[in-house]
């Protein structure tokens, strides 16, 4: 079982932040995973939307 360290909500769906990369203009490039672990994707996320420790 994976422990949630940080999450972000996009379009009313919660995603686990697996990894982060470069930051630019108050956004950070993140690797995100769905809570059930079936979807993994990359997206630019507003830093202020991330909840938890990254």
Question: What spans do the regions from the language model cover?
Answer:
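Basic/aromatic-rich interaction segments and small domains that mediate binding to polyanionic partners
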Residues: 9-45
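Structured surface patches comprising rigid loops and adjacent beta-strands/short helices at the edges
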Residues: 44-53
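Short coil-to-beta transition motif at edge beta-strands of beta-rich domains
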Residues: 1-11
């Amino acid at each position: 079982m994976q422990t949630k360290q940080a999450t972000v909500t996009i379009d009313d769906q919660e995603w686990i932040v697996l990894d982060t990369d470069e930051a630019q203009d108050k956004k950070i490039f993140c690797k995100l995973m769905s809570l059930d672990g079936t979807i993994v994707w990359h997206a630019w996320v507003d830093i202020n939307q991330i909840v938890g420790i990254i």
